[in-house]
Amino acid sequence: MAAARPALGRVLPGSSMLFLCDMQEKFRHVVYFRQIVSMAARMLKVARLLSVPTVLTEQYPQGLGPTVPELGAQGLQPYSKTCFSMVPAVQQELDARPQLRSVLLCGVETQACILQTALDLLDRGLQVHVVVDACTSRSQVDRLVALSRLRQSGAFLSTSEGLIFQLVGDATHPQFKEIQKLVKEPSPDSGLLGLFQDQNPLFR
């Protein structure tokens, strides 16, 4: 019997959603927070241009504050949660989209809410693309090990630019020029080179 074909991880606007996880005021001290928020904001702009549905969560906003304004998520109604996974809070959004195949995941913290959200989505048979330059943790050890754990569990590790080009698909797309302007904006250092260099054994 032929071996099962591995998932390719294709991302298409009509079968994808963008998840924005807990980028709130009280997390400003988290390492590379400003940088990953800027990349998540870029993903949100592209999602709006391509009509990709987007959901936004806030972890215990009474204590951790609202979503930071620089994300540009004004107009999105945040889902308040206490569970680390986003999935229980946004289950109705998932149920409303039977065509959904892929979730693009940005936010904080990688070892907690990002990991548990990804595991719940994978358990539902969805493909998960963790936007590595739009996720971070207070500890870079936690960030590194969480990314490795996500990969072991079947999530795809992708950069924002790689996913953006998958979503737009073709230079003749009517939104390509607007998206190209976003891609050409300088990308901040989100600390990833230090995690992946020197043949890190967690990513062999």
Curated annotation (Swiss-Prot):
Gene3D superfamilies: Isochorismatase-like. InterPro entries: Isochorismatase-like_dom, Isochorismatase-like_sf, Isochorismatase_domain. SUPFAM superfamilies: Isochorismatase-like hydrolases. It is found in: Cytoplasm; Nucleus. Keywords: Cytoplasm, Nucleus. Its main location: cytoplasm. GO terms for cellular component: cytoplasm; nucleus. Pfam families: Isochorismatase. The keyword Zinc does not apply. The keyword Nucleus applies. Belongs to the isochorismatase family. Interacts with CDKN2A. This is Isochorismatase domain-containing protein 2. It comes from Bos taurus (Bovine).
